[in-house]
Amino acid sequence: GDEGGRGPVRNKILRLSDGSLLAPASIEQGEWRCFMDRSEDEGETWTRTADIRLPEPAGERPNPYGAIQPSLWEDEAGVHALLRTSQGYLYRTDSEDLGRSWSQPASSGIPNNNSGIDLVKAPDGTLYLACNPVGENWGARSPISLLISKDGGAHWEHLTHLVTMPGEYSYPAVLWQDGCLLITHTWQRKSIQFWKIRL
């Protein structure tokens, strides 16, 4: 169900530097809101954080309104998440206590069309983000692209487009393995496309 700690919703679990597990989670009933489930016993039990809500908009609220489907990484400064929103941009929130509490989300400046994202941190600290960089709520889910950050997510640059054809290419998942990015995403909601990119 949607209540209580459950583990991840869409995006992958992150093992933190203290050995605990952090699972990104969200609810899409009414106001969209996200939270994290944290486990200190290898997933036997989970503790849910407080909801992470967007600040109130200056104008009329879009429907739906809020943030869902966080994607996580950890570095020396703390634990961080990018959030899917209905605001035309990905939002970012940060934690200084290993995911127990989170800052109020703020725009990352990365255009997003209210479509799923995923990211991974390489061993050298570089972040790779797969997303639809289209700044319109419910906008076209093409292209699907790969962005890169070398400064902990403060700035992002376009690395490559995975697909630019018209259509729907969304819900990416990204892993790092043996010097390669392993990426999947939907293809027209009919099948799954897979990429292996050696870096």
Regions found by a protein language model. Give the residues of each.
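Asp-box/BNR beta-propeller blade signature and adjacent active/binding-site loops
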Residues: 1-199
